[in-house]
Amino acid sequence: MHSSLEPEKMEEGGGSNSLKRKFSEIDGDQNLDSVSSPMMTDSNGSYELKVYEVAKNRNIIAVLGTGIDKSEITKRLIKAMGSSDTDKRLIIFLAPTVNLVKQQCCEIRALVNLKVEEYFGAKGVDKWTSQRWDEEFSKHDVLVMTPQILLDVLRSAFLKLEMVCLLIIDECHHTTGNHPYAKLMKEFYHESTSKPKIFGLTASAVIRKGIVSSPSNYAAQVSELERLMDSKIFNPEEREGVEKFATTVKEGPILYNPSPSCSLELKEKLETSHLKFDASLRRLQELGKDSFLNMDNKFETYQKRLSIDYREILHCLDNLGLICAHLAAEVCLEKISDTKEESETYKECSMVCKEFLEDILSTIGVYLPQDDKSLVDLQQNHLSAVISGHVSPKLKELFHLLDSFRGDKQKQCLILVERIITAKVIERFVKKEASLAYLNVLYLTENNPSTNVSAQKMQIEIPDLFQHGKVNLLFITDVVEEGFQVPDCSCMVCFDLPKTMCSYSQSQKHAKQSNSKSIMFLERGNPKQRDHLHDLMRREVLIQDPEAPNLKSCPPPVKNGHGVKEIGSMVIPDSNITVSEEAASTQTMSDPPSRNEQLPPCKKLRLDNNLLQSNGKEKVASSKSKSSSSAAGSKKRKELHGTTCANALSGTWGENIDGATFQAYKFDFCCNISGEVYSSFSLLLESTLAEDVGKVEMDLYLVRKLVKASVSPCGQIRLSQEELVKAKYFQQFFFNGMFGKLFVGSKSQGTKREFLLQTDTSSLWHPAFMFLLLPVETNDLASSATIDWSAINSCASIVEFLKKNSLLDLRDSDGNQCNTSSGQEVLLDDKMEETNLIHFANASSDKNSLEELVVIAIHTGRIYSIVEAVSDSSAMSPFEVDASSGYATYAEYFNKKYGIVLAHPNQPLMKLKQSHHAHNLLVDFNEEMVVKTEPKAGNVRKRKPNIHAHLPPELLARIDVPRAVLKSIYLLPSVMHRLESLMLASQLREEIDCSIDNFSISSTSILEAVTTLTCPESFSMERLELLGDSVLKYVASCHLFLKYPDKDEGQLSRQRQSIISNSNLHRLTTSRKLQGYIRNGAFEPRRWTAPGQFSLFPVPCKCGIDTREVPLDPKFFTENMTIKIGKSCDMGHRWVVSKSVSDCAEALIGAYYVSGGLSASLHMMKWLGIDVDFDPNLVVEAINRVSLRCYIPKEDELIELERKIQHEFSAKFLLKEAITHSSLRESYSYERLEFLGDSVLDFLITRHLFNTYEQTGPGEMTDLRSACVNNENFAQVAVKNNLHTHLQRCATVLETQINDYLMSFQKPDETGRSIPSIQGPKALGDVVESIAGALLIDTRLDLDQVWRVFEPLLSPLVTPDKLQLPPYRELNELCDSLGYFFRVKCSNDGVKAQATIQLQLDDVLLTGDGSEQTNKLALGKAASHLLTQLEKRNISRKTSLGDNQSSMDVNLACNHSDRETLTSETTEIQSIVIPFIGPINMKKGGPRGTLHEFCKKHLWPMPTFDTSEEKSRTPFEFIDGGEKRTSFSSFTSTITLRIPNREAVMYAGEARPDKKSSFDSAVVELLYELERRKIVIIQK
């Protein structure tokens, strides 16, 4: 090998290229500052224009060197393609990294007037549907994305390449091998019938590492790139164009001597240390295996970390010297010190790595000067530093180069290094070297995807610092340097030779300033480096004629895949579509599946045309996988669903001309107050109701009284056509008169005012909702329902009267006033002088028989009942309703307001009881009011006064209907709502159709199972859902355990999870359309309408769907927290929490179990589509398999255990297997039985709690089960019953854990509360569960016998009165109920976690501290300390619940002797600093929110409100937020705020039309008062 290359060898390959330098120039230390040709530019951009013209006509790969503005070319090309007159086709710009995507997107947006958008994985595009992609394609013209995104979109057939007119590929030299660029071209471009134009951009056509041995080798790589991209390399002829317009770059080498050999003694010491600590890690790994924790991957990580650190230190030692090797060890040590591990074993591994690096530091330190082991004075001792090996010759030359920059502050230098460790240690060296203090140095390395946010921020900030001269020396790696936007520099130094031609070419692009340099470091006498540089400089890019035809296309690849040919979607073995991983997860494999192995399962999955998983078949997913929080069945996701109609309420009799036959159901009402009479009613339906629906009772809760409603069937009844008309009149008249309106239209709205029953009301009678509610004669027998036709006929006569005589227009056509007697023939002679007669609009009545008479106002259509005739009053009496109105008398009021001239103004006024809206009578709000809003002592709640109307009798028409009928009509909306709910429950029961002997399930149970907590009822699905969850888990576990005897516990758990997961239950539930039956909204009586009733409170549908049923489409899903759950539109659409759909399935399983046991619940599961079953033969087979196992008893090892559990096993091996830990390495262990026993105990305990505590609420039931069913509780059961002594094990770590647990088992906590600081080993809880599983099999699935054995073992089970919540949760709930906030602070010193909780009471700041292994345990201990302090002040969860008091009832004042000294933090801040609040948000709810955040921040208790209401017949006027509002009610609230260490502040707000607005007003007034007292400062 020659030491230099002759000139003729430099010219090999022909042609003269000024970039090819003669190697004879490299062998000397020539002056690197030789002057080059001045830089030449062309203001017209001739070169860019030439490239653009060629790219416009054909596919090219533009090799753009230094100084060429590729943005200008891209802009011209995009503008030309984007402005074409053809149909819209997309322009796609591809960049290989996310940083480049963002950078190019910003540049393109600034350059072109088109709609540009960027796409990459972090935007969640992997989950986008076809509709979402279609929206993106339609809204944007230019799409900038990574190639993998485009590849996935094409594979899913969301996009076809025919829709693209231009494909720009940046850094296109990556189009090789398995890069997404190459896959894109092979799979789609060459297959496309209408190909887009290709424009490739690169600085070098070849990227591959290694030495390019010959021009032909290089040309072959270029040819391969051209074939794949269907394009030609474009370079100007002999690069004259480039050299003409590119910046001049001066290039020169720096030669350095080889590094002297390091001390063999030192290297041997380092190697010995590495082997020693590596062996320590291996020993820890062996111990980890004994504990049977899955630690192999973690140990491999630590071993790899140890080896990497060792190699990095050796690299620095060989190439940079002793000092840098010492610095490298420091860097590695800092990194390992930042590692936090919770496991003791992992902490030991981390400690081993740390001790290794400390040992390395100590070993290297011996060879460095003792006075300063970091640095030497390079200015004075550079030669001795090199000789001693402290600094390598290469590093010395770098420092000499940097020293030449002294005094030139404008000098900016980029230094390219191969390894990150090189950049880090040299940066440290430079910063510590005093002679280089004039340099501002930083390093920038590759952006690892796992890098934290601060590191990613530095990737952006460091180049900016370099550009503005704040950093003049920047170390970078070639990975960052390629494609990264690094600012201009005056010197580019390749400290390590570039490995690829692309990297070499890119390195030249950064030296773009005038008189710039490009410097290579070369080792003297190193032929490998010289040859490598030679090949890098011989970039033999073939210059071809731009007008020549393109190279032949790449042959289409062989596709081993699965897809939909019609639309082009496909999955291939190397597909990145997630369905391949999903498919692979369904296979049981010992090793990770290969890409080819994933493909067959993909074909078995049910996929849609876009290869997304459809809902048609159950997806078997891995257990406990971290699915999206907004997936199906999650709490976060809300879904729009329709509401199923009750078929029993439908009818076709509306148009029958011959009458109709009905099924009659009588409603009887009985009040608990004697003398209160309610009329019975009859419900007439076309359908026959189920027995338990047609005969039901319910309680109706009125104010201070209870009415029992009972429904009973009364057989068939037939109505003639005439009777039907009158019956419909009655229903329309009363339901509209009392809950709606009888007069429709308004002059103010420009519509004619009409009597409702004079108009066409057929639209109010819909066949899906057709029934009649008619009064029944009061003396009727309970078993029959005789319609009260006298009342109905009276109503019909009034309807006819109003059609002719209602005062609708109030003035005649000439604008004259109307006389009430004009044209009303039915009126008696007004000259009648009988003093006891009262003249009504349609009749006269005796004055003494007016009480409870039902009347209707003929000018408003409102229905009243008469209380009395007011003596000494008449229409000429002073108008007292509104003194400020200006009306002198009632007669004047009616004359001026309505244009009515009264014919009998001297008659006494009628005192009338007004009709009101319907109320929800199904919930006992009286009881709830006592619990939630009981006023504080001394403030007795006043009963609201009754508001009566006063009208002249001649404006009233008498209706001969008892007032008891009106009273009953107020009850009917609630009765019908409950009855309709039961009809739906019965309808669902018929669909499920469980025909099992001696089985029946009530509609009430079904109704409970479909009612959520958001529906304010006295029942909900929660308890049944809790039970159903356990039943389903138990059944699924038994089914899998018996069906798959060869599967291990992990496989069984994954399959069970796939069955019982919320997402699977959601899929099955929606496939059965159960979502329409779910009741999740409050009953709104004002929106309930009877057939024929006009709704006063319509909610028009704005859901974007015309049908009642809502399809399962992502556009009807949301995560919006402001969505109102359960509030339906008039089409029945409402938002439902996705988890409620899954919970409904479990609740129905629970309901069927309660009614019919496991057989009924199994039927329910099968109806849903859950494939589970109990085959008795499988149980026998399982016992037979166990019985055949060889078992030789050893000294009665099982007899003692059988005695403890009081059961003798028929299959002894079951018990042997149940106590065998896997550490014994037998062919069996307890894991499968533990899987079964876990579900058995969960089910048995849940069933016990469900049956024992029937009145316990769902929340407390969940807490009880959690307290009973957990591994810690079972571990205590094992120790208490001495079952742990029978656990067969051979694991040192487990043995230690058990012994430690036994020692701390009886150790009391310092707070006196049972918070074990040591968690029980999982194996102890597992053995209890495995024994339960063994017992279940041995008893042939006899659950009662298993419970007989385990109930005494588990006793005493926790009871509601002894339930102890986790301390932190208990504190949180207690403070929430009392209106107090607390502040939490957590920290971790690497050994233990510390937690501090501060709670501010009225006059004392309480502090609780805790220190434990984890933050959770530390918080629990801190909360426990606080709860203990609160209990001393008689503040606890039990006392507040027991006394049934609110936060205002609890005495929070402390005796002065008990007061704790406030911390200096609290006293000083409160005494000196006045806190700021606001600015106040004046929108509705804004002031309350502002005060809430302030109280939370400063630990002030939440305020309390006391509200008074005033009602009026005439509307109040309010000015609220600059807007005028009117309301018949006025609310005024008083707020009380307890400020710590001050007197309570009380302030009243202004009157407002609603209660919440009055709260806001009170808060605003309070805040201004606080500011006046200088307690707070309100920010403007």
UniProtKB/Swiss-Prot annotation:
GO terms for molecular function: ATP binding; double-stranded RNA binding; helicase activity; metal ion binding; ribonuclease III activity. It comes from Arabidopsis thaliana (Mouse-ear cress). Residues 622-633 have a biased composition (Low complexity). GO terms for biological process: defense response to virus; RNAi-mediated antiviral immunity against RNA virus; siRNA processing; ta-siRNA processing. Residues 985-1157, 1198-1340 form the RNase III domain. This is Endoribonuclease Dicer homolog 3. PROSITE patterns: HELICASE_ATP_BIND_1, HELICASE_CTER, PAZ, RNASE_3_1, RNASE_3_2. Residues 51-223 form the Helicase ATP-binding domain.
